[in-house]
Amino acid sequence: MKNTFILLFLLFLFVSCQQKIKPEDIAKINGYWEIEKVVFDQGKEKDYGVNESYDYFQIDNKNKGFRKKVMPQLDGTFMVNDTQEDVKVRFKDDKVFFDYATPYAKWSEELIAISDKELVFENADKKEYHYKKAEPLNISDDGKKTK
């Protein structure tokens, strides 16, 4: 009986602590994001150190946009190509999904958490992708802020 009570309490605590993502939170995703780690369904983690590429998201007020891989350069700019994934944001049953499409594939990921500095997605294989907000690099000595 005691174990059942503890289990129910922990379950309640877990459910009540999940972030409720609102439509206005989606605007926070616009910009550059650097992957920090991936958490696999068995709890194993893969940490990422320095990343050669960032994910750039641009979502409009109609919840449509794109995700593109960009490579930060030492002067604060980004190298880009023409490849991108179209994105549609979908709200369903108090959950938020990002539906991706390319000419070759379609898939969805659930948005688990978002803030001004952190972003977490979960894919169909139950892998969680943890991102941190990224800034352009600038190691030049001119003291100027990059755009």
Language model feature labels by segment:
Residues Q19-E34:
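N-terminal helix-cap/turn-to-beta initiation motif at the start of protein domains
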Residues K46-V87:
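N-terminal glycine/threonine-rich, aromatic-flanked beta-hairpin/loop signature
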Residues E122-K147:
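Edge beta-strand at a domain terminus
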Residues I29, F57-G65, F91-K95, I112-L119, ...:
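Short, solvent-exposed coil/turn segments at beta-strand boundaries
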Residues M79-I112:
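An anionic, turn-rich surface loop/hairpin at beta-sheet edges
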Residues S108-Y129:
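Short, compact, well-ordered microdomains
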Residues L13-S16:
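C-terminal motif of bacterial Sec signal peptides marking the signal peptidase cleavage site
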Residues M1-L8, Q19:
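Positively charged n-region of N-terminal signal peptides that target proteins for export
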